[in-house]
Structures are given as C-alpha cells and as structure tokens.
Swiss-Prot record:
Lineage, highest ranks first: Eukaryota, Metazoa, Chordata, Craniata, Vertebrata
Gene this chain is encoded by: WAP
Name of the protein in question: Whey acidic protein
Function text: Could be a protease inhibitor.
Matches recorded under Pfam families: WAP
Recorded GO MF terms: serine-type endopeptidase inhibitor activity
Disulfide bonds: 13-41, 24-46, 28-40, 34-50, 68-99, 80-103, 86-98, 92-107
Domain of life: Eukaryota
C-alpha cells in the first residue's frame, strides 16, 4: 500500500479546464473509491476520475461533515451542456458539499453516516 499523504494543507481537485474532453466517463464515485493519494475529481462537466490532488495551504482547512448523495448515472453517455457551480466544498455555502449531480457539479446538502442504507 502507498503511504497516506502527509503534506500540510488541504487536498483539492484541480480546476476544470475548457480544453478537457467532454466525454461522459465516470470512473469513480467518491474519494474512497480511488487509490490512496488520489481524489475523485470532475474532469469535464459529466465525467469523474481519480486524480492526484493539488495541495493548498490552508490555516483552517474546510472540513464539511457528511458525504455527497448517491447519484444514478445514465447507462448511455449524453453530452452535458450544464456548467459546474463548484469544484470544491469550500466554494459552497453553509454545510453544502460540491457534488456530482448527474451532469455537472452542484452544491448539495450532504448525507450523514446514519442516512446510508
């Protein structure tokens, strides 16, 4: 097993680039579904993949409770025309988290551990 990231700061997904491929490929659901040392990040408006995160120094990292709600992804790829509202939790108000919402990244209310089935 690879060692855990032990760098000071907060691991964040890189900002999306307009040059990213718009293919709808979902290769991860959340950080826990990725190899150690990577995060599940949006790579286009409708794709997610395990990516080496950027480390940003933050005197008080934003740690929001809960997880993103589970989203049923379509079985067939569709071109997504929606724009992302966020790329990181700290871009969302209150306790909302930046989550994939079938086509784009949105600030959504998190689900708590006891609401998992």
């Amino acid at each position: 097993l690879a060692p855990a990231l032990s760098l000071p700061g907060q691991a964040v997904c890189p900002e999306l680039s307009s040059s990213e491929d718009n293919a709808c490929i979902i290769s991860c659901v959340n950080d826990e579904s990725c190899p150690q040392g990577t995060k599940c990040c949006a790579r286009s408006p409708c794709s997610r993949s395990c990516t080496v995160p950027l480390m940003v120094s933050s005197p008080e990292p934003v740690l929001k409770d809960g997880r993103c709600p589970w989203v049923q992804t379509p079985l067939t790829a569709k071109h997504c025309l929606e724009k992302n509202d966020c790329s990181r939790d700290d871009q969302c108000e209150g306790n909302k988290k930046c989550c994939f919402s079938s086509c784009a990244m949105r600030c959504l209310d998190p689900v708590t551990e006891d609401s998992f089935q």
